[in-house]
Amino acid sequence: MPATLLRAVAGSHRVLSKAHQCRRIGHLMLKPLKEFENTTCSTLAIRQNLDLFLPDKTAGGLNKSQILEMNQKKSDTSMLSPLNAAHYQDEKAHLPTMKSFGTHRRVTHKPDLLDSKWFIKILKRHFSSVSTETLVPKQDFPQMKRPLKASRTRQPSGTNLPVVSVNEDLMHCTAFATADEYHLGNLSQDLASHGYVEVTSLPRDAANILVMGVENSAKEGDPGTIFFFREGAAVFWNVKDKTMKHVMKVLEKHEIQPYEIALVHWENEELNYIKIEGQSKLHRGEIKLNSELDLDDAILEKFAFSNALCLSVKLAIWEASLDKFIESIQSIPEALKAGKKVKLSHEEVMQKIGELFALRHRINLSSDFLITPDFYWDRENLEGLYDKTCQFLSIGRRVKVMNEKLQHCMEPTDLMRNHLNEKRALRLEWMIVILITIEVMFELGRVFF
């Protein structure tokens, strides 16, 4: 009887140890599974650990059909082969001896401890999320090239024009500024030698202007006319492109301080005009000339429009010159901001100041930008056409903006001039101090020696 009790106690001890071992195995197998959901590297670690405690002796506790079924599952899911082999064991099958866990006992595996369908579902969900992140390529959008930036001061009237209907009677008026001044006397003779006819029916107070007629106009509705202003501008009315190029070539011989060709062709003004019945006017960017006027009155109205166009193109040239000057002094505030020395001599600073004063003198003193010319004082109808065209071309606003820019440009140049004057005064003071020191040394030498 005591022997029977001892065997029963020993058997219960083995049962408890086996149950405890099953709990340890389940806990150790579930922990890597949770880590497997987070990272793919943990999946490889599980496979390596399971390969250690799954020797070939495991097949001894399985029948033949179960081994074949297990091998088929292993071929389907190669990465999950150790776990699938453990899942397909029945009640007679046992887990292999696991030396890695520090024991030689074999414990019975609980069939529903790990559900392969649940585990495969987790893996599919994990790999599907990974694949969506890795398979989507990064799209490289092509860089769009920016369009070329136009001049900051350029405001051609053509950009403000509304869309007009196609009209066969529509003619063109184009203005260019090619130089600072023209020799009108020599130009008149040169153009007359090329077959152009001078119009001499202008009033006596319309000085500093030359009007030439063209035989072959661009369209038959209006005779071709060219206005040359002494200020260095030319306005073409209903003139062919071929004739315009020829006149511009002849004009090069009589220019004083000509401008760059590219700048001349860029800073131009072009308006469309048409002959109508009624009073002449500028309506929505289109010149409408009275068709009932005689030749002399039509020339005067064209002169009013041409005068405003001349001011616009001259102002555009000076705006471009001011922009170029601003770029030349742009390094001064940048150098002062960075604490660097400004490498400008006193002569260069005075030259910059002279350029500013010359440009301001041209705009405010030697041109008609600020006041209406005397020619329009007793001609109210022509003054209205002139003012309307100047307003359309924004001449008053552009002159105001340009004067403000000139005022701002004077500040860094004045600063540099004062700085150079202070350096010169400091240099003179040091020279005086050195001379006084030398004189004192001579006096001391005379006293003591």
UniProtKB/Swiss-Prot annotation:
Transmembrane intervals: none
Keywords, alphabetical: Mitochondrion, Protein biosynthesis, Transit peptide
Q: Where in the cell is it found?
A: Mitochondrion
| BP-aspect Gene Ontology terms | positive regulation of mitochondrial translation; translation
Q: Where is the transit peptide?
A: 1-16
Keyword Repressor carried by entry:
no
Cellular component per GO, a single term: mitochondrion
Top-level taxon: Eukaryota
Its job: Required for mitochondrial translation, possibly by coordinating the assembly or maintenance of the mitochondrial ribosome.
Complex and partners = Homooligomer.
PANTHER family named in the record = REQUIRED FOR MEIOTIC NUCLEAR DIVISION PROTEIN 1 HOMOLOG (PTHR16255:SF1)
Homology family = Belongs to the RMD1/sif2 family.
* Name the UniProt record assigns to this protein: Required for meiotic nuclear division protein 1 homolog
The UniProt gene name for this protein comes to RMND1
